[in-house]
């Protein structure tokens, strides 16, 4: 098949991409090429996937650029250029797979070309976004978990395809060191009630470490330096450590993250929001590391209670996390690995998307 992947202008796509959306696009593109398809990618000029043709809209990720007179208009203008490019060249392909941020921008183009388009929704299902998507009842929308799908009350979501990871890269390690691991985006964001919250839950991980005396390793990208300075840095000591750059766009290299995941005795998913998937949980389990997470978003869907980790009611707070941690030695790392291999591999993800591509093409 001739397949067009429509990426985001916000960040580049590559093996070293830090954002989950960009990493998934990279894995899909690589997997499709491996299966013999011809793949093109619309996105940033510095995106790089072996044997994939890049069609540039912007030199590099918009998140890295500055100096615009009006940042909103600048980003919107690039999105319009991207949408027009999809409309111009879309008919040259058998199928289009849309991942743009925001995803709905290319739904306008899909109504004006004959080539079928699949749109994978990566974003949180806010009420405004849900309503906007519902204006395209014929769009082929895919969510990334059943929990994610259930968040949309108006939009018609036809299919669910789990994200996949390179299980060979996130390889198995049975021997663990004595530390807990938290990796995520640091920063306060507004919730549905317009209150600022620590969405990824770094503060919960710190509270657990303080309550138990456990060693905690924290890493990720710092989107809000003030949050890091106020909420994280004052708590750092010989037991609670930050590893990696203090940067919005940079974090540890993938190989370094894998090593941390392989040796951690537990990965903490202490989120304060309804996360649609949670790629880091799957990566940790692939390394044989169990997950302890709050029952929000897709956590209970991805983690098998008592077998690959523990799911804690958010209302139980630190005490619930502590109880789960006390049972962590009951988890067999081999079960974590098997669960990741059987359900969340790149091969499985690509196979599921190929089935959807063929199904759409047959309908034409």
Placement of each model-derived feature along the sequence:
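Catalytic cores of nucleotide-sugar-dependent glycosyltransferases that transfer UDP/GDP/TDP-activated
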Residues: 1-364
């Amino acid at each position: 098949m001739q397949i067009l992947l429509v990426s985001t202008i916000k960040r580049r796509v590559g093996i070293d991409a830090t954002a989950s959306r960009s990493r998934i696009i990279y894995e899909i593109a690589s997997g499709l090429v491996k299966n013999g398809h011809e793949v093109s990618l619309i996105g940033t000029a510095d995106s790089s996937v072996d044997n994939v043709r890049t069609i540039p809209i912007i030199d590099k990720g918009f998140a890295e650029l500055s100096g615009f007179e009006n940042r909103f208009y600048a980003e919107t203008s690039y999105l319009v250029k991207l949408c027009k490019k999809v409309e111009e060249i879309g008919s040259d392909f058998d199928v289009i797979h849309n991942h743009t941020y925001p995803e709905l921008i290319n739904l306008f183009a899909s109504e004006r070309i004959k080539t079928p388009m699949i749109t994978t929704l990566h974003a949180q299902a806010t009420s405004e976004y849900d309503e906007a998507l519902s204006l395209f009842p014929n769009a082929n929308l895919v969510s990334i978990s059943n929990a994610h799908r259930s968040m949309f009350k108006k939009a018609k979501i036809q299919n669910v395809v789990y994200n996949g990871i390179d299980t060979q890269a996130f390889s198995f390690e049975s021997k663990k060191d004595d530390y807990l691991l938290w990796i995520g985006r640091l920063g306060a964001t507004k919730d549905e009630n317009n209150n600022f919250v620590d969405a990824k839950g770094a503060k919960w991980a710190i509270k657990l470490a303080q309550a138990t005396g456990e060693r905690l390793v924290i890493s990720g990208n710092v989107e809000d330096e003030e949050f890091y300075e106020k909420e994280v840095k004052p708590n750092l000591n010989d037991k609670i450590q930050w590893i990696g750059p203090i940067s919005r766009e940079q974090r540890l290299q993938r190989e370094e993250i894998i090593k941390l995941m392989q040796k951690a005795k537990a990965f903490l998913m202490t989120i304060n929001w309804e996360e649609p998937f949670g790629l880091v949980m799957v990566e940790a389990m692939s390394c044989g590391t169990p997950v302890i997470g709050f029952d929000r978003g897709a956590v209970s869907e991805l983690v098998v209670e008592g077998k690959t980790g523990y799911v804690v009611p958010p209302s139980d707070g630190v005490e619930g996390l502590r109880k789960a941690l006390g049972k962590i030695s009951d988890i067999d790392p081999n079960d974590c690995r098997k669960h990741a291999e059987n359900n969340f591999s790149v091969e499985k993800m690509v196979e599921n998307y190929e089935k959807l591509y063929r199904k759409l093409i047959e309908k034409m």
